[in-house]
Amino acid sequence: YKNTDKASLYANDDGVHQFAVAPSGSADSAINWTTAMIIDNAGIVRKTYQPAFSANAVETNNVPINTWQTVNLTEIFDNNADFNPSTDAFTAPVGGKYQLNGSIRVDNLQEASGYMYIRINTSNRGYYSIVSPPAFDSTPQYWSLVINHLADMDAGDTATLSFYIAGGTVGADIHSESIF
């Protein structure tokens, strides 16, 4: 160990390259290595703790109109424990660029609604996409709003998915096929 939390190990076995890291310990103590990256003979790179998550929406009926609604989510997978289902938020573990994608399936929307937004809201800014139901010739049974953005996030910044519907007399429904 050169410094605290600076232990690293490289191993090569039958052409498979393995990179491991560990917090420092004391002399003669066991080291608990964590495999950070593996590169196999085919050149396939695996980063076990690379931040990645997927969550689908909890079906929500009659979403309130004229107010932002954070989409309630259920975790599908979370590689690095960076998604918190109790807050419906992803937290960036380190500073960097993060590809964030969201899709909301809206059911029972009204032609009388003024417009609908989907937003990925990060600690630094919000990213929006909009659609205007009055442009339809009739009331659609369902509609999908999609947003994709490469966001610059600092360590500890959060990202959530939200929805807004303006006007109309009743809110639409967020279907469980919606994802973040």
Can you name each region flagged by the protein language model?
Residues 19, 39-41, 46-47:
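Extracellular beta-strand solenoids
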Residues 139-158:
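Short, surface-exposed tryptophan/glycine-enriched loops
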Residues 111-125:
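Short, surface-exposed beta-strand/strand-loop-strand elements in extracellular ectodomains
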Residues 18, 117-121, 160:
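Beta-strand signatures of extracellular beta-sandwich domains
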Residues 1-27, 51, 113-115:
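Self-maturation zones of extracellular/virion spikes and adhesins
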